[in-house]
């Protein structure tokens, strides 16, 4: 059926008025163009046109092939009208080749298709979406010819028949209306066609989009015919939407030959969708939803990230590290062009290497589902042509057909069984992975195609994976190919009973009653989120730059580096992954957090290992507390990269975040006692959880392992902290960093507050502690018997402090935070102290000393004593209010104030146990003291003391800053024979769990040449590493101690000498002795007299010297710097000290690379006797 003349004129007039109303500017722009012979399109929105006149819409849907030429004619008339109405100008010239291009059809099944049209669609105008898989060469098409009748000389024009492949069918008789009826015609064009009767012509083949098909469906293809300006508008691999009329065509008929009809789409307009996200609409509402999600996780963004990771491939249990890596690869980096014009790829590539059954293919399948433009192929049977591009012969000519990588341009290409690709085919993807193009020279066709795709590959090792060999040997892939992967994760299916049990229960639970978690994101939401974050363009910050560059340099210098992997590509990989992680976290700046996370992931992959060594990615599960894990990664990585300033800033930021979270969770009116009780409870619970013993395969995180038996004293020395952070948070670490932050004003006021709060802290502890109330004696005994395991050389596993001691340390560190309550409780403090003093005096003196030494009540700094005796010796302070101090003899010199224990000086002795105090003073305490105490005491003795500077630097930096003033020198005014003192067995024990945050030094006054003496207290293991001496060394040590004493005639009763902890049996014996009472020894009065004769004498020739810089040697577990050696003749005998050789090359052992804890106090315990 054809349109009538009135209908044709109506359509023409309506369309012309529509163009003049809506597209006048477009037409003017076309008229200004210089090339008169080119073809120019005017894009018309179908919805707007149909709204203007519904009748036109009906005609258009019914007779598209007839209406489209009418539109073109109306467009030419409209252009002429615009030209005449416009101001005359030489620029404006009429263009004959104008085409109306219809787009924006209403989205309804009749007009919009995602599948290839069928026969019933013939003659309809449709939009079809698909992927270009083949493009033919551009040809010249002669679409009309002029003929002349030989008889009547009538000239007429014959059109090429589209349905017969543009063949010309001459009429059977002359078309002259006068009735010539001649059958003889001559073609006027002769051998050459005039340009006006020819046009450009190209055929392309589109294929249904794979991701829109059901599983098992083979995508179908369709030929699309492009003419005029549509030619070369797309290329192989493009996602396009074609608007056009479905038509059928056939070859010319031949006798006895079957007529094959072919459906083709005659295109009216082609829209390339590469930049658009297929199937995902992102509006403000969707964006707002994700912004609210991240606002909710503002104080703990890593928890939000882990929620997204848990939704990634939820059918696979655990594999936290792999999920993080896949998420970063899917997010992708930022593609950029440098100053020289070189394009640097933004897409990352990931290779999963693993034993069968480790879930590799599951990740590939899931990634294909949530990525808009993706191709999944198996390496088995894939040829280089199948992956890149192939030349095929069609209709007597060669064409290029796109392979998997080209089809995945701008998306994701997943290749399973990667090692099954033949060697010569595998090299064909080198260019596709790095330059992201494919250069082809096949069958006379030379071209270059884009392959801007992310490659996610999975492969099995050949045979069993051998950790001793390199990756390239295990999976038989060459170094050039391996170096192009940003991450290579190894999943080793090792025998792990705990892991197998968890996995089997997870699978069986899903089989029995499959349930959908409320918190997991749906696949649609994941797809939308990954499409949204690809629009973010993160910029690198200075901190992240510094970390990535430092890590790259360390990798290059590493002994175990893989030369094929640690090329400049490693640095580019780090940058891409950091940008990807910033995108994943919905940020437009790459922060230090992103850089640290990327370094930790890279360390866990086969490219890493410079910091942590190779790690198995299989047995990793989600951390209970992501911030704790991240904090530990920060300390580990930044310490190892020697970026202490960045570490300090980041820890401050984390503390601030944690404080904000805490304030939100708990009302501000919470009392100090409640906080203390809560902290104590946490610490006790963490004690009971005990240290977990991680398996070799555990990495960035793992399940909490079963507790170790209490009697087991052998620590796991493997560096596992990054892989297996303990679930319990190290509260004291946070408190100390917060304390450092609060104390950066340079004054010592905070120390006063700390001391004033100690009694209050202790009092609150007794009120709120979940432990039964025990006398100090029993407590000391219990602590010794319980904690034989806790202070071994196990510096690699984060240590859990003894329950009570840890909680008390927490209380102490929290104390300065509660400054507002000092005045209320200061009076209670004095009464409490008196009460404890009398309680201590009831027991016999040595028992009291045992109680002091092993007590775990709280930190008791006798500031009143300090003030009193400082005043008497140097008249620096005015007066004190503590009545107990007046009872002590006034002969106590300044040095007597110095060695105050930071942990357990709980019982203040008075004159009744002065004998015990004198003995203890004789053997000067080597306990750790907090930095605050050292500074307070330094102030007290003014210029006679070392100078300490307190800043905001991290502990290690503080350690390196303090210096000595060159004025003090200790001298012994008494005879040498009197300088020998016995060491009581009850006084040479160190508290097993006692390792506070650690870099505080014992800054006592001492001769400069002895100032470097350090004592490394590492429990029994520490003892084994020290040289074993004979019993005769005891007297030598005692003499040395006597010389060093230099005037410390009397120290109040809580100063003791702490040495390495004895074995548990010895501790038990000591505890019995303490309880026994009468079996202990008293000091004779002559010794006290000799002690009281020591005095100070300063030498002008003394030189100040700073302590040695402390370095970490992760491979060397020995303590190199102590000049004070411990000699053990028999493990059940008391320990004695001898001065070692000062010139010995030495390094103080710090925490292991994998330890969560700060620097261990014991290893940095400088003793200045």
Swiss-Prot record:
Annotated localization: Nucleus
Cellular component, GO annotation: MCM complex; MCM8-MCM9 complex; nucleus
Residue intervals of the MCM domain: 302-507
Keyword field: ATP-binding, DNA damage, DNA repair, DNA-binding, Helicase, Hydrolase, Nucleotide-binding, Nucleus
Compositionally biased spans, kind Basic and acidic residues: 932-947, 968-979, 1065-1075
Gene Ontology biological process terms from the UniProt entry: DNA damage response; double-strand break repair via homologous recombination
Cited CDD domains: MCM9 (cd17760)
Catalytic activity: ATP + H2O = ADP + phosphate + H(+)
Top-level taxon in the UniProt lineage: Eukaryota
Annotated binding of ATP, by residue: 354-361
Biased composition (Polar residues): 691-710
Outcome following mutation: residue 484 to A: Loss of function
Disordered, as annotated region: 685-751, 784-804, 926-1009, 1053-1080, 1098-1121
Molecular function per GO: ATP binding; ATP hydrolysis activity; helicase activity; single-stranded DNA binding
Family matches, as SUPFAM superfamilies: Nucleic acid-binding proteins, P-loop containing nucleoside triphosphate hydrolases
Comp. bias (Low complexity): 785-796
Role summary: Component of the MCM8-MCM9 complex, a complex involved in homologous recombination repair following DNA interstrand cross-links and plays a key role during gametogenesis. The MCM8-MCM9 complex probably acts as a hexameric helicase required to process aberrant forks into homologous recombination substrates and to orchestrate homologous recombination with resection, fork stabilization and fork restart.
Subunit structure: Component of the MCM8-MCM9 complex, which forms a hexamer composed of MCM8 and MCM9.
Family classification: Belongs to the MCM family.
Protein name: DNA helicase MCM9
Organism: Gallus gallus (Chicken)
Gene from which this protein is expressed: MCM9
């Amino acid at each position: 059926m054809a349109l009538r003349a009135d209908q044709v004129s109506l359509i023409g007039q309506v369309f012309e008025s529509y163009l003049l109303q809506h597209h006048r500017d477009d037409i003017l722009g076309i008229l200004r163009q210089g090339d008169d012979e080119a073809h120019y399109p005017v894009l018309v929105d179908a919805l707007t046109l149909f709204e203007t006149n519904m009748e036109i819409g009906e005609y258009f849907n019914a007779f598209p092939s007839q209406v489209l030429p009418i539109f073109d004619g109306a467009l030419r008339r409209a252009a002429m009208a615009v030209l005449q109405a416009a101001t005359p100008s030489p620029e404006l010239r009429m263009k004959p080749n104008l085409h109306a291009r219809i787009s924006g059809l209403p989205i309804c099944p009749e007009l919009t298709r995602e599948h290839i049209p069928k026969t019933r669609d013939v003659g309809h105008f449709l939009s079809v979406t698909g992927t270009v898989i083949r493009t033919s060469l551009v040809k010249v098409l002669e679409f009309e010819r002029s003929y002349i009748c030989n008889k009547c000389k009538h000239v007429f024009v014959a059109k090429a028949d589209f349905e017969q492949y543009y063949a010309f069918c001459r009429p059977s008789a002359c078309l002259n209306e006068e009735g010539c009826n001649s059958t003889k015609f001559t073609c006027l064009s002769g051998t050459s066609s005039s340009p006006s009767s020819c046009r450009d012509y190209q055929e392309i083949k589109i294929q249904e989009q794979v991701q829109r098909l059901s599983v098992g469906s083979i995508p179908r293809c369709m030929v699309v015919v492009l003419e005029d300006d549509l030619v070369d508008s797309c290329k192989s691999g493009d996602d396009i939407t074609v608007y056009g009329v479905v038509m059928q065509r056939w070859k010319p008929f031949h006798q006895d030959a079957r007529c094959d009809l072919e459906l083709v789409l005659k295109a009216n307009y082609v829209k390339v969708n590469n930049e658009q996200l297929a199937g995902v609409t992102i509006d403000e509402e969707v964006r707002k939803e994700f912004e609210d999600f991240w606002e909710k996780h503002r104080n703990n963004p890593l928890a939000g990230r882990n929620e997204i990771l848990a939704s990634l491939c939820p059918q696979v249990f655990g594999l936290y590290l792999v999920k993080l890596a896949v998420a970063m690869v899917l997010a992708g980096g930022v593609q950029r062009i440098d100053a020289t014009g070189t394009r640097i790829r933004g897409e990352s590539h990931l290779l999963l290497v693993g034993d069968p059954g480790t879930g590799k293919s599951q990740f590939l399948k899931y990634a294909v589902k949530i990525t808009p433009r993706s191709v999944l192929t198996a390496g088995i049977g894939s040829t280089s042509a199948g992956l890149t591009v192939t030349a095929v012969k069609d209709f007597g000519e060669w064409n290029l057909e796109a392979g998997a990588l080209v089809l995945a341009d701008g998306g994701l290409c997943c290749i399973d069984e990667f090692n099954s690709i033949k060697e010569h085919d595998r090299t064909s993807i080198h260019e596709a992975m790095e330059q992201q193009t494919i250069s082809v020279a096949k069958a006379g066709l030379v071209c270059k195609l884009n392959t801007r795709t992310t490659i996610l590959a999975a492969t099995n090792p050949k045979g069993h994976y051998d950790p001793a060999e390199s990756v390239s040997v295990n999976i038989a892939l060459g170094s050039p190919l391996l170096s192009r992967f940003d991450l290579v994760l190894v999943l080793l299916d090792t025998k792990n009973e705990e892991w197998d049990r968890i996995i089997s229960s997870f699978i069986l639970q899903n089989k029995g009653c499959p349930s959908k978690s409320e918190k997991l994101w749906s696949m649609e939401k994941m797809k939308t989120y990954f499409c949204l974050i690809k629009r973010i363009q993160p910029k690198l910050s200075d901190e992240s730059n510094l970390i990535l560059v430092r890590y790259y340099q360390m990798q290059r210098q590493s002994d175990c580096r893989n030369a094929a992997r640690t090329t400049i590509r490693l640095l580019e990989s780090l940058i891409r992954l950091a940008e990807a992680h910033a995108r994943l976290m919905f940020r437009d700046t790459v922060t230090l957090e992103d850089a640290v996370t990327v370094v930790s992931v890279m360390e866990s992959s086969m490219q890493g290992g410079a910091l942590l060594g190779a790690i198995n990615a299989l047995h990793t599960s989600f951390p209970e507390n992501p911030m704790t894990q991240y904090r530990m990664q920060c300390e580990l990585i930044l310490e190892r990269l020697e970026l202490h300033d960045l570490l300090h800033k980041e820890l401050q930021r984390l503390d601030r975040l944690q404080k904000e979270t805490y304030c939100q969770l708990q009302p501000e009116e919470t009392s100090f006692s409640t906080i203390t009780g809560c902290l104590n409870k946490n610490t006790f619970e963490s004690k009971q959880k005990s240290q977990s013993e991680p398996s070799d395969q555990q990495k960035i995180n793992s399940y909490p392992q079963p507790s170790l038996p209490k009697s087991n004293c052998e620590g796991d020395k493997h560096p596992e902290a990054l892989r297996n952070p303990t679930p319990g948070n190290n509260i004291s670490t946070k408190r100390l960093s917060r304390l450092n932050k609060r104390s950066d004003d340079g004054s010592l006021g905070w120390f006063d507050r700390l001391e004033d709060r100690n009694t209050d802290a202790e009092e609150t502890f007794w009120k709120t502690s979940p432990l039964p109330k025990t006398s100090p004696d029993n407590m000391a005994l219990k602590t010794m018997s319980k904690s034989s395991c806790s202070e071994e050389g196990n510096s690699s596993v984060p240590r859990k402090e003894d329950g009570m001691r840890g909680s008390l340390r927490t209380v102490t560190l929290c104390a300065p935070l509660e400054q507002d309550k000092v005045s209320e409780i200061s009076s209670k403090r004095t009464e409490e102290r008196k009460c404890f003093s009398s309680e201590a005096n009831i027991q016999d003196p040595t028992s009291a000393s045992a109680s002091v030494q092993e007590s775990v009540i709280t930190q008791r700094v006798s500031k009143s004593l300090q003030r009193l005796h400082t005043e008497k010796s140097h008249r620096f302070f005015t007066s004190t209010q503590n009545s107990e101090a007046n009872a002590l003899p006034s002969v106590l010199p300044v040095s007597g104030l110095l060695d105050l224990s930071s942990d357990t000086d709980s019982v203040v002795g008075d004159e009744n146990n002065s004998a015990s105090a004198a003995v203890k003073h004789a053997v000067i305490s080597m306990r750790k003291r907090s930095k605050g105490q050292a500074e307070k005491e330094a102030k007290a003795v003014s210029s006679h003391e070392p100078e300490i500077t307190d800043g905001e630097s991290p502990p290690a930096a503080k350690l390196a800053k303090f210096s000595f003033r060159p004025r003090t020198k200790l001298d012994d005014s008494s005879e040498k024979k009197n300088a020998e003192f016995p060491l009581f067995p009850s006084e040479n024990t160190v508290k097993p769990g006692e390792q506070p945050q650690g870099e505080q030094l014992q800054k006592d006054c001492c001769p400069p040449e002895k100032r470097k003496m350090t004592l490394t207290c590492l429990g029994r293991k520490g003892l084994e590493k020290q040289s074993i001496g004979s019993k005769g060394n005891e007297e030598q040590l005692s003499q040395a101690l006597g010389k060093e004493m230099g005037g410390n005639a009397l120290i109040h009763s809580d100063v003791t000498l702490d040495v390495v902890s004895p074995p548990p049996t010895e501790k038990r014996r000591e505890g019995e002795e303490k309880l026994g009472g009468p079996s202990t020894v008293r000091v004779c009065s002559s010794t006290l007299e000799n002690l009281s004769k020591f005095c100070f004498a300063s030498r002008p020739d003394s030189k100040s010297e700073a302590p040695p810089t402390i370095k970490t040697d992760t491979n060397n577990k020995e303590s190199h710097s102590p000049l004070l050696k411990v000699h053990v003749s028999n493990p059940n005998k008391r320990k004695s000290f001898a001065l070692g050789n000062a010139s010995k090359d030495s390094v103080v052992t710090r925490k292991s690379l994998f330890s969560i804890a700060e620097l261990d106090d014991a290893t940095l315990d400088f003793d200045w006797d």
